[in-house]
């Protein structure tokens, strides 16, 4: 599955009138690496894969689950919503 994290639209207000588009891939890689306790070497491998990759990376369902879990535990609701949408709309290659 491809998850588009390099052009992630994050809505800054509840009415969704203000947003920012950011490259979140490396930011999420750092979160997994520094705060992904419990994922062990799989988390480390995913963080390295994300850091060195691009929007064309294929993620397994297990990797998507790690991304979702770490983001939900460590970031703001607006960021969580954006990442969950990217995962849900990911494409199978």
Where are these regions (language model features)?
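Positively charged, low-complexity terminal tracts
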Residues: 1-93
